[in-house]
């Protein structure tokens, strides 16, 4: 593996624009939940921003990048606030484009999960550490969102749509590909796997088993 490329590779130098699309989508998803919960404008903005940058903050904390990227590059925060404002202002209209928002959300999940995996590889974590770091990077914002909104984290019970599982699989793919390809190629391969798993699960072709105990 090209250690120099891995050391110098950052999201800002790679798919920065796609990263911001993911931030925008995550912010909208968080803000829409706040609107449904009848939060005021401040609450909606906070929930949207936390959802958008929470996963990235976890990623940066796990990989030793301080302060987090969203504080070093305020474009992320401005994008998150824009997404939250759009959701607050046009919540009913945006809800009609659920499939489009889901596509952006999946893109953000794929990018955050795989970038978290790359960061974990850079600091020398093993395969399980890479998978765990990547998964938390992808789903961390959503977990924080649901806890703030007093909801059971959606990733824990939505078996009809692979989400955390897709993030973990994408991170694992990055670990497998990184020794043989450039960081960009490894991330692209992992991201494509995340998108594929999200696609097949939305069509209910793949589900995780659920254990039911007698009442």
UniProtKB/Swiss-Prot annotation:
<keyword id="KW-0472">Membrane</keyword>
<feature type="transmembrane region" description="Helical">
    <location>
        <begin position="101"/>
        <end position="121"/>
    </location>
</feature>
<feature type="transmembrane region" description="Helical">
    <location>
        <begin position="75"/>
        <end position="95"/>
    </location>
</feature>
<protein>
    <recommendedName>
        <fullName>UPF0126 membrane protein DR_2368</fullName>
    </recommendedName>
</protein>
<dbReference type="Pfam" id="PF03458">
    <property type="entry name" value="Gly_transporter"/>
</dbReference>
<keyword id="KW-1003">Cell membrane</keyword>
<feature type="transmembrane region" description="Helical">
    <location>
        <begin position="39"/>
        <end position="59"/>
    </location>
</feature>
<feature type="transmembrane region" description="Helical">
    <location>
        <begin position="15"/>
        <end position="35"/>
    </location>
</feature>
<comment type="similarity">
    <text>Belongs to the UPF0126 family.</text>
</comment>
<feature type="transmembrane region" description="Helical">
    <location>
        <begin position="162"/>
        <end position="182"/>
    </location>
</feature>
<dbReference type="InterPro" id="IPR005115">
    <property type="entry name" value="Gly_transporter"/>
</dbReference>
<dbReference type="GO" id="GO:0005886">
    <property type="term" value="C:plasma membrane"/>
</dbReference>
<feature type="transmembrane region" description="Helical">
    <location>
        <begin position="123"/>
        <end position="143"/>
    </location>
</feature>
<keyword id="KW-0812">Transmembrane</keyword>
<keyword id="KW-1133">Transmembrane helix</keyword>
